Amino acid sequence: MIQPRFSLTPLALAAGLFAAGHAAAQTVPDTTGQPIQTVVVTASADASAQGLPSDYAGGQVARGGRLGLLGNVDMMDTPFNTTNYTHALIQDQQAKSVADVVQNDPSVRVARGFGNYQELYVIRGFAVNSDDLAYNGLYGLLPRQFVASELLERVEVFRGANSFVNGAAPGGGGIGGMINLLPKRAPNAPLNQVTLGGESSGQVYGAVDIGRRFGPENRAGLRVNAVRREGETAVDAEERELSVFSVGADYRGQGFRVSADAGYQNHKLENARP
């Protein structure tokens, strides 16, 4: 039996090697010229790696906010109705308290409590007492009756089934929604801000806001706020005094974040209109 024999000529062998080399070259990805993604760490009251949701166009509201156990959620991804007011709006409108901020929301009405002078917020027809305001997602940490805006980085208004994601408010309110207040944190750049003001009624105002970051990679931060307001208001014979001091500290570690807040507020109102 005759067995056929096959032999490669030099030309065929060279063509085979060229084809193999060409195929191998296509399997190696080209990594030259690819940009390296830059990770920017920003200071925020939120412990997640992403930090607070970014500002919307104009900077006075944010694109998202905290939804209790769901964490920070973009406004286009949540089944609830939320509005998240930033520190820029607080400064632009010279808001004095939480009431001045939430009055921008058409679904929120502001009143005073029965028999006292606490701020009362009505969301979708249901009352939310100032006792039921949340501070960084937690109840029972804020002063009763009045919260100065100088303590706050953001004011988040949640409208809907509040207890489903945030838990029941201790005061029994919050049926139609809730208000969550976010504390200030030291920014990446040094902050030195002094504000002085006065009103035609005779009330004078002064505030100091200082923020610094320390240590390796600016991991530790400190934010200090001090406020003093005194004098007559726009209401005849009514006088208001306000003293506020707060300190917010935070540390950004490898895979964890730690923060602490301490504050003092003394609000005095004389000859107030009921």
Predicted regions and their residues:
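Cleavable N-terminal targeting peptides that direct proteins into the secretory/outer-membrane pathway or into
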Residues: 1-35
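Short, charged, low-hydrophobicity "junction" segments
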Residues: 8-22, 127, 131-135, 195-198
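Short, structurally constrained coil/turn elements
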Residues: 19, 35, 104, 216-218, ...
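Short, compositionally biased, intrinsically disordered N-terminal export/targeting signals
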Residues: 36-37, 224
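Acidic, small-polar-rich N-terminal luminal/periplasmic segments of exported/outer-membrane proteins
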Residues: 37-189
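Outer-membrane beta-barrel domain signature
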Residues: 142, 166, 196-197, 234-236
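Short, glycine/charged-enriched secondary-structure capping and boundary segments
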Residues: 170-174, 239-240, 274
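Transmembrane beta-barrel wall of Gram-negative outer-membrane proteins
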Residues: 191, 198-272
